[in-house]
Amino acid sequence: MKLTWYGHSAFRIETGDAKILIDPYLIGNPSWTGGWEGPAEGITHVLLTHGHSDHISGALEVLGKSGAQLVANFEICMYLVGKGADGSKINPGNIGGTVDCGGFTTTFVQALHSSSFGEDGGKNVYLGNPGGLVLHFPEDRTLYHMGDTDIFSDMALINELHEPKIGIVPIGDRFTMGGAVAALACRRFFKFDTVVPCHFGTFPMIDPTPEKFEAGLEGSGVKVALPKIGETITI
């Protein structure tokens, strides 16, 4: 599996024939100034955890260029179709559901957060419940992108049901759990081989580094992968 980080919670995942963008915050992202065209190249699927602008700003452009399938909750799918996304290429779901994405499946799981999109004039459009995404690949390990969330005890059920081995974990505090709590979640509820921290260092209000997360996982046997922004790593 190849993984590229574009800052914040935006990742490109490549395994088998699947080329996936998760939460493609590629427009207006202070951490990523490389544009959306490169990350969109060859993309087969766009997956969204929730509707905040720092997770979907760039999704419409990527979908328009790539012709990729959109996998998100029903409200986000309908909202983006209303903004110009191709309604024949949506694959909606909701918490607890699993959708066949062609070559892999995606299960929608809960996250403790909120989900809306701020439009001009201060209007916030409700975009369904926030979530995490569990990606099952037939010839690769299962990956869990937690979305934006705090720790919650039902993470134990996510592990029991799906046994993810790769975790993408928000650690920036204020809007998600912080690094120490995120490390506790990984240790207590999961048996990850590798974790990739995200949602840090993007804005002054959130933690600038993953130091607390790394410290919390010392001695756990879990590998903390820290790709540079724009770097592709193999997991």
Swiss-Prot record:
SUPFAM superfamilies: Metallo-hydrolase/oxidoreductase
Entry-linked Gene3D superfamilies: Ribonuclease Z/Hydroxyacylglutathione hydrolase-like
SMART domains reported for this sequence: Lactamase_B (SM00849)
Swiss-Prot/TrEMBL keywords: Hydrolase
GO molecular function, one term: hydrolase activity
Cited InterPro entries: Metallo-B-lactamas, RibonucZ/Hydroxyglut_hydro, UPF0173, UPF0173_UPF0282_UlaG_hydrolase
Family listed: Belongs to the UPF0173 family.
The protein, known as: UPF0173 metal-dependent hydrolase mll0680
Provenance organism: Mesorhizobium japonicum (strain LMG 29417 / CECT 9101 / MAFF 303099)
